[in-house]
A protein has these predicted regions:
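NAD(P)H-binding glycine-rich loop region in Rossmannoid oxidoreductase-like domains
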Residues: 6, 12, 39-95, 101, ...
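N-terminal Rossmann NAD(P)H-binding glycine-rich loop of SDR-like oxidoreductase domains
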Residues: 4-28
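Short-chain dehydrogenase/reductase
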Residues: 115-138, 168-172, 195-196, 227, ...
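Substrate-positioning beta->alpha
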Residues: 168-174, 187-210, 217-218
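Conserved beta-loop-beta element that borders a ligand/cofactor-binding pocket
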Residues: 138-164
C-alpha cells in the first residue's frame, strides 16, 4: 500500500497506541492530535509521529491547530455522543478521504438473539448508555454518508487489551487478591464465552482498512476468534500470576443491586456470551488473522506489572466492593 497521511485523534489509549505503532511500522505518516494529557503515554508513541495539541471536543481549537490540512485518513478515538461526530463531519468534510469512527461492539443487541454476532446484528443495548450513544453516533454518520457522501468507515472493537490492562473490572486489584488469597469475584457462573483481543491483532486489521474505498459506508467489527469462558480468563491470569485463587461466583443482578455502575457494565456487556463472525474484516483485509492467544497476552500483562511496583496499584474502593460481594454470597447460595 502507498504511504498515507493519517490524523489520529486520541492516540494514547490501549487501542489507539497500538494502531499508531502499526501505522508507523507500515510507513504511513501519522499525526496525533490530543490535549497532551493521555495517561497511556506510558507506552510511548514512535518518534516519527507528529504531535499536535488541541482539544478534540472544541471545533475552533482543532481548526486552528490543523489549519485546513487534508489527510488521507482521519481516525477518531474521542467521539462518544452524536454532537462529537456532527462536529467532526463539519470539520473534516472535504479534508479527508476516509473518516474512521471507533464505535463499540457493546452496541450490538444485548443479549444477542443469535451467535455468532455479525455486522447485521441489530444495535440495541437497553442496559448501557455508553453503547446507546455509540449507536446514535453511527446513525448520524451513516446519514451523512447517504446524504452527502461523507466518507465514513465504522469500526466496532470488542474487549481489546494490552500489557498495561488487566481485563477485569477492578484491574490489578483482582490480581492482588488472587495472590494474597482474598476472595476473587467472578460475575455469574463464569461460563459465558467472551471474545478477548490483543491490541496488536486489532491494530493490524485496523490499519489494513486505511485507504480502502470498499470500506466506506460500512461498519465492521475487529476481534479475535478466541472466545474463552470467564472462568478460563480468570484461570489464565491466575496461572500467569502464579496464584491459586479462591473464587466466589456472584450473579450479575446481585452485583447490579450493590453497585449499579458495575452492574450496568456487566448486564450491558460482559455477562452475555459474545462470539463474533469476522468474515467481513477478513474479506476487507485478506492477509489478516488474529494470532496472539490470550495465554501469551496474560503473561505479558503480569510481566509488565511485575516489572515496576508502581504499576501494581490496589484500588481500595474496588477492594472493599469485592469484600462486600463475597460476604453476601452465603445468603444467596444457601
Amino acid at each position: 500500500m502507498a504511504q498515507l497521511t493519517a490524523l489520529v485523534i486520541g492516540g494514547t489509549g490501549v487501542i489507539s497506541t497500538a494502531c499508531v505503532h502499526e501505522a508507523v511500522r507500515r510507513g504511513h505518516r501519522v499525526t496525533v492530535l490530543n490535549r497532551g494529557t493521555g495517561a497511556h503515554g506510558r507506552l510511548s508513541l514512535p518518534p516519527e509521529v507528529e504531535m499536535i495539541q488541541a482539544d478534540a471536543h472544541d471545533a475552533e481549537s482543532v481548526r486552528r491547530a490543523l489549519g485546513g490540512r487534508h489527510f488521507d485518513v482521519v481516525a477518531t478515538f474521542m467521539a462518544f455522543v452524536p454532537e462529537d461526530v456532527r462536529r467532526d463531519i463539519a470539520l473534516f468534510a472535504g479534508h479527508t478521504a476516509q473518516y474512521i469512527f471507533i464505535s463499540s461492539a457493546s452496541a450490538y443487541q444485548t443479549p444477542p438473539a443469535h451467535l455468532p454476532v455479525t455486522e447485521s446484528t441489530p444495535l440495541h443495548n437497553p442496559f448501557w448508555q455508553y453503547s446507546r450513544n455509540k449507536a446514535a453516533c453511527e446513525e448520524t454518520l451513516l446519514a451523512a454518508y447517504r446524504e452527502s457522501g461523507f466518507p465514513v468507515t465504522i469500526v466496532r472493537p470488542s474487549h481489546t487489551y494490552d500489557p498495561t490492562m488487566v481485563p477485569f473490572d477492578g484491574g490489578w486489584t483482582v490480581v492482588d487478591r488472587m495472590r494474597r488469597g482474598a476472595p476473587v469475584i467472578v460475575p455469574g457462573d463464569g461460563a459465558s464465552l467472551w471474545t478477548i483481543t490483543h491490541h496488536t491483532d486489532f491494530a493490524r486489521a485496523f490499519v489494513g482498512l486505511w485507504g480502502q474505498p470498499r470500506a466506506l459506508g460500512h461498519a465492521v467489527h475487529i476481534t479475535s476468534d478466541e472466545a474463552p469462558s470467564w472462568n478460563e480468563i480468570f484461570a489464565t491470569i491466575a496461572a500467569a500470576a502464579g496464584a491459586e485463587p479462591r473464587y466466589v461466583h456472584v450473579p450479575s443482578q446481585v452485583i447490579a443491586g450493590v453497585d449499579p455502575e458495575f452492574g450496568a457494565a456487566l448486564l450491558g456487556d460482559k455477562a452475555n456470551s459474545m462470539i463474533f463472525d469476522n468474515t467481513l474484516v477478513k474479506r476487507l483485509v485478506p492477509d489478516w488473522v488474529a494470532t496472539v492467544p490470550f495465554s501469551h497476552g496474560a503473561r505479558e500483562i503480569i510481566a509488565w506489572h511485575d516489572a515496576d511496583p508502581s504499576r501494581r496499584t490496589v484500588d481500595p474502593t474496588w477492594d472493599a466492593l469485592f469484600d462486600r460481594l463475597a460476604a453476601l454470597m452465603p445468603t444467596f447460595e444457601s
